[in-house]
From Swiss-Prot:
Entry function: This protein is an aporepressor. When complexed with L-tryptophan it binds the operator region of the trp operon and prevents the initiation of transcription.
Keyword tRNA processing in annotation: no
Name the UniProt record assigns to this protein: Trp operon repressor homolog
Region: Disordered, residue numbers: 79-103
DNA-binding residue intervals: 59-82
One Gene Ontology cellular component: cytoplasm
GO molecular function: DNA-binding transcription factor activity; sequence-specific DNA binding
Keyword check for Repressor: yes
Provenance organism: Vibrio cholerae serotype O1 (strain ATCC 39315 / El Tor Inaba N16961)
Amino acid sequence: MVQQPSFSEWQQVLDLVKQAVQQEQHEMLLTMLMTPDEREALVARVNIVHELLQGELSQRQISQMLGVGIATITRGSNELKSRSEDEKAALAQLLMPPPSSEA
């Protein structure tokens, strides 16, 4: 009998991360699961989506600012284009919270 991996679907990984957040173990989990290069790539991807949602810079400018290839920006742009307006609004809310009103 062939053994199956415990985690075979993306949703299972998302559930694991959610559980780790609830237990305040998410930093440990994500650090353990991702190499430094993968964490750096994820930070770049978050910044790509953030900049694309802001819409103030061209893809070339984003590429230069973040030090990533234009193809990486294009992939992020294409993924964003495939999302519904509701999903884009939710992403914008996550990535661009309103400025704090603290004085």
